[in-house]
UniProtKB/Swiss-Prot annotation:
It comes from Mus musculus. Pfam families: NTF2 (PF02136). InterPro entries: NTF2, NTF2-like_dom_sf, NTF2_dom, Nuclear_transport_factor_2_euk. It is found in: Nucleus; Cytoplasm. Residues 17-136 form the NTF2 domain. This is NTF2-related export protein 2. Keywords: Cytoplasm, mRNA transport, Nucleus, Protein transport, Transport. GO terms for cellular component: cytoplasm; cytosol; nuclear RNA export factor complex; nucleoplasm; nucleus; perinuclear region of cytoplasm. GO terms for biological process: mRNA transport; nucleocytoplasmic transport; protein transport. Associates with NXF1, NXF2, NXF3 and NXF5. The keyword Transit peptide does not apply. Regulator of protein export for NES-containing proteins. Also plays a role in mRNA nuclear export. The lineage of its organism: Eukaryota, Metazoa, Chordata, Craniata, Vertebrata.
């Protein structure tokens, strides 16, 4: 029974970290995009609608070329990733979906998945993005 309680605590901690991360990520994306790369690991990979971007410099260039955005998150889910699958690195899978407008234009539905890893600093633990997959979910006209 103690194992189940410990896992529940682990899940609760992961969800709190995910909620905090999502608030920071989308506020930074909308209002301070130049600072967004600080949330990524040095060798992080972004897949944006099938286009692969790897490394901080490439990420900074990619985010700089995107038009201004207004994200609204409608759904958030998270779960810890078992440490056997991540070489004992504390990792959380975060899944979001919602709507976004770029340059105030047409609203698009989107889905975004993040793999966050815990990075220890002398004073705290910081979550960094190892992998990020963004995809529009718009349906074609039927």
């Amino acid at each position: 029974m103690a194992l189940a309680v410990n896992f529940k605590t682990y899940v609760d901690q992961a969800c709190r970290a995910a909620e905090e991360f999502v608030n920071i990520y989308y506020e930074t994306m909308d209002k301070r995009r130049h600072a967004l790369v600080r949330l990524y690991l040095d060798k992080a990979t972004l897949i944006w609608n099938g286009n692969v971007v790897t490394g901080l410099e490439a990420l900074a260039n990619f985010f700089e070329m995107l038009p201004s955005s207004e994200f609204q998150i409608n759904m958030l889910d998270c779960q810890p990733v078992h440490e056997q699958a991540t070489q004992c690195q504390t990792t959380v899978l975060v899944v979001t979906s919602g709507v976004v407008k770029f340059d105030g234009n047409k609203q698009h539905f989107f889905n975004q998945n993040f793999l966050l890893t815990a990075q220890s600093t002398p004073n705290s633990t910081v979550w960094k993005i190892a992998s990020d997959c963004f995809r529009f979910q718009d349906w074609a006209s039927i």
